[in-house]
Amino acid sequence: HPFTQMKTAGPALPIVKGNGTLLIDDKGNAYIDAISSWWVNLHGHSQPYIAEKVYEQMQKLEHVVFAGFTHSPAVELCEKLSKHLPSNQAKFFFSGDGSSAVEIALKMSVQYWKNKGENKTRFVALDGAYHGETFGAMSAGARSIFSAPFSDLLFESTLIPFPKDEQAAIKSLKTEIAKGDVAAFIFEPLVQGAAGMRMYKPETL
């Protein structure tokens, strides 16, 4: 139970099923699950359409590695997503969770510059950033009580002001990029959840 505060916790609630926004324990008590920002809960529990489609796919193919192979569900999803992106951003990498996606994004950005013969290895993020619990994800975010035990193992990233003052944030970002060693700017689009639900204007992006 890694997300339980053991100093104050009582007995863990035994959850046996979920339905929509509700979690049901072994005595039939219902609890509203308000943690929809964590992982895969945002569509609700036991969502019939999702369950049906997952079942149908598992009857055909559960997984194949994208190393000389492909499959139509992934291709179809990429085609749908690409319609919403600029043509120079129509690239996709599927990951099992957010932290892993961040790790891969950091590695890809460094490799991109290495392939171009440029040594750009520094990352820029917004003040208050949270990108996950793996070492790279923690390194690319704001330091906190949760990352403190691992501080000696984390690489340094540069934090620029949260764009409450849009022009100040953009000016700071331009200053850092001009130094010539920035591999990537990683940011939470529109809202920082872990930092207290801080939001900024879509136009800033």
What is each residue range found by the language model?
Residues 25:
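Acidic surface patches and DE-rich sequence motifs
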Residues 1-22, 36, 69:
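Active-site-adjacent loop/helix segments that line or gate small-molecule/cofactor pockets in enzymes
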Residues 31, 37-69, 76-96:
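Glycine-rich phosphate-binding segment of PLP-dependent enzymes
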